[in-house]
Swiss-Prot record:
Source lineage: Eukaryota, Metazoa, Chordata, Craniata, Vertebrata
Role: Part of the tectonic-like complex which is required for tissue-specific ciliogenesis and may regulate ciliary membrane composition. May be involved in apoptosis regulation. Necessary for signal transduction through the sonic hedgehog (Shh) signaling pathway.
Protein name per Swiss-Prot or TrEMBL: Tectonic-3
Signal peptide range in chain numbering: 1-22
Keyword Plastid in annotation: no
GO CC terms, sorted: ciliary membrane; nucleus
Coiled coil feature spans: none
Membrane topology: Single-pass type I membrane protein
Species this chain originates from: Homo sapiens
One annotated GO biological process: cilium assembly
Length: 607
């Protein structure tokens, strides 16, 4: 006997023949909906197609013909089911207080059925719907609590589809409101243990790692600080003092300083004083922080260039720092072993809005025990030059990159110079402010400005040239201005342009050519000025020109092949044809011979 509770079960009764399975679909795309064959069940709580209600279903083999009686509760009252309800967050509602066209979720449109008004709905303005469809012919009766429809697909087959509430397809959902009434319940469901921070004293690492800030120590004040490498920030490239130098990170930075009152900043600003860049020590390893006064862990900063204190002389601030170059030698986990610094200084004119461009260079290299060992420098190729790598120059067994002039923001010559890149033609220029001096000193100053300090004497033939091996370097040819070319005894001939001509070529195998320098020449162009002329500045130009003189060999060619062939009359059947036209005419025709043979046979038969 059935219990009353079983009568309350709501059944979704589907009859499927063998081998038929429902196919889920996110949307019945391509299917054109027919008239809405959706009917809410009456007291029976079933959804039935009108055409299927009157039709008599034939018996399906293998299935019982007697359908069990389904007892279901009454369906809820009749109400309109909105298959595309308005989203809680309308992403296309861009105009407050006005209706956005084709935005089906815009509440300002006041449309009950926006699909009937708009030609289409913008993406994200309607809920994405998920449908599960099967062939309509296999459905006998449906009392699904979800909305259902019958669609006609592109092949004309009716599909029975059930709309499933799939919240995963709709990403914009209303967040649950949290108030005093439901807070405890939500906290019990979603709450967890809070994280409490515990202060733990960590000992400094035993050695530097790449990128770690470098520690410094000021014995005079017993203060531990960091080695700074000011860098430019913003559109104007203002100097940021807080930029730390990273361990094993060789790089260069440039920044600009502006002074409201250079007369007072000349001697008070530590950034202009050379002593502020070497009056401290560097800690070998980070663990030296625990005992910074131990001289065993301190590395003094060695000054390798002449540096004078800033001095305000009249309207000029002399000996201000314009370039700082640190050379740091490291020895793996043993830390920093040696630190040296070289400074470049210049003079500034005290004027409103004065500025100074500073250049900071930081180089790391492996520590060498032997002082006689040559300084290692980066290669520009191995062995041949690589396009874009620096052109290597040599002066007094010191290898460095050849450079060109570089101008500051106001057009004056900067202490910083452009590197000459192999295979890249370049030109640069600037204005040099001249001091009152005799002609020889003026010429010497301009020559040094054009080719840089020190003056290049040799150029590396290959990119991996060793400074100790003179055979791997070629001497630079110089062509100075001819003094006899001018007919003026009271004139001074000064250089105004330097052209660096580099002849290079590819050598080696065609499959792996190597670029090498064949020769370099410095070509100066000069102009004469009167000694009586008060020239305050002169425009200088430097350019480099690479000329490819590669002579490519002839492409390889194979040996001539023998023309092997049989003689024309090799086959005996062609002997007659190989005797020429005359012999063919004199030969007996095969047809005539055949006729004679037939005539002889006939005569024999008649006898």
């Amino acid at each position: 006997m059935r219990t009353p509770q079983l009568a309350l079960l709501q059944v979704f009764f589907l009859v499927f023949p063998d081998g038929v399975r429902p196919q889920p679909s996110s949307s019945p795309s391509g299917a054109v909906p027919t008239s809405l064959e959706l009917q809410r069940g009456t007291d029976g709580g079933t959804l039935q197609s009108p055409s299927e209600a009157t039709a008599t279903r034939p018996a399906v083999p293998g299935l019982p013909t007697v359908v069990p009686t389904l007892v279901t509760p009454s369906a809820p009252g009749n109400r309109t089911v909105d298959l595309f309800p308005v989203l809680p967050i309308c992403v296309c509602d861009l105009t407050p207080g006005a209706c956005d066209i084709n935005c089906c979720c815009d509440r300002d449109c006041y449309l009950l059925h926006p699909r009937t008004v708009f030609s289409f709905c913008l993406p994200g303005s309607v809920r994405s719907s998920s449908w599960v469809c099967v062939d309509n012919s296999v459905i006998f009766r449906s009392n699904s609590p979800f909305p259902s429809r019958v669609f006609m697909d592109s092949n004309g087959i009716r599909q029975f589809c059930v709309h499933v509430n799939n919240s995963n397809l709709n990403y914009f959902q209303k967040l649950q409101k949290v108030n005093a009434t439901n807070f405890q319940a939500l906290a019990a469901e979603f709450g967890g243990e809070s994280f409490t921070s515990t202060f733990q004293t960590q000992s400094p690492p035993s050695f530097y790692r790449a990128g770690d800030p470098i520690l410094t120590y000021f014995p005079k004040w017993s203060v531990i600080s960091l080695l700074r490498q000011p860098a430019g920030v913003g559109a104007g490239g203002l100097c940021a003092e807080s930029n730390p130098a990273g361990f094993l990170e060789s790089k260069s930075t440039t920044c600009t300083r502006f002074f409201k009152n250079l007369a007072s900043s000349c001697t008070l600003d530590s950034a202009l004083n050379a002593a502020s860049y070497y009056n401290f020590t560097v800690l070998k390893v980070p663990r030296s922080m625990t005992d910074p006064q131990n001289m065993e862990f301190q590395v003094p900063v060695i000054l390798t260039s002449q540096a004078n204190a800033p001095l305000l002389a009249g309207n000029t601030c002399q000996n201000v720092v314009s370039q700082v170059t640190y050379e740091i030698e490291t020895n793996g986990t043993f830390g920093i072993q040696k630190v040296s610094v070289s400074l470049g200084q210049t003079n500034l004119t005290v004027e409103p809005g004065a500025s100074l461009q500073q250049h900071f260079i930081l180089r790391f290299r492996a520590f060498q025990q032997s002082t006689a060992a040559s300084l290692t420098s980066p290669r520009s190729g191995n062995p041949g030059y690589i396009v874009g790598k620096p052109l290597l120059a040599l002066t007094d067994d010191i290898s460095y990159s050849m450079t060109l002039l570089q101008s500051q923001g106001n057009g004056s010559c900067s202490v910083k110079r452009h590197e000459v890149q192999f295979g890249v033609n370049a030109i640069s220029g600037c204005k040099l402010r001249l001091k009152k001096a005799d002609c020889s000193h003026l010429q010497q100053e301009i020559y040094q400005t054009l080719h840089g300090r020190p003056r290049p004497e040799y150029v590396a033939i290959f990119g991996n040239a060793d400074p100790a091996q003179k055979g791997g370097w070629t001497r630079i040819l110089n062509r100075h201005c001819s003094i006899s070319a001018i007919n003026c005894t009271s004139c001074c001939l000064i250089p105004v342009s330097l052209e660096i001509q580099v002849l290079w070529a590819y050598v080696g195998l065609l499959s792996n050519p190597q670029a090498h320098v064949s020769g370099v020449r410095f070509l100066y162009q000069c102009q004469s000025i009167q000694d009586s002329q008060q020239v305050t500045e002169v425009s200088l130009t430097t350019l480099v020109n690479f000329v490819d003189i590669t002579q490519k060999p002839q492409p390889p060619r194979g040996q001539p092949k023998m023309d092997w062939k049989w003689p024309f009359d090799f086959f005996p059947f062609k002997v007659a044809f190989s005797r020429g036209v005359f012999s063919q005419k004199c030969s007996v025709s095969p047809i005539l011979i055949l006729c004679l043979l037939l005539l002889g046979v006939l005569n024999l038969e008649t006898m």
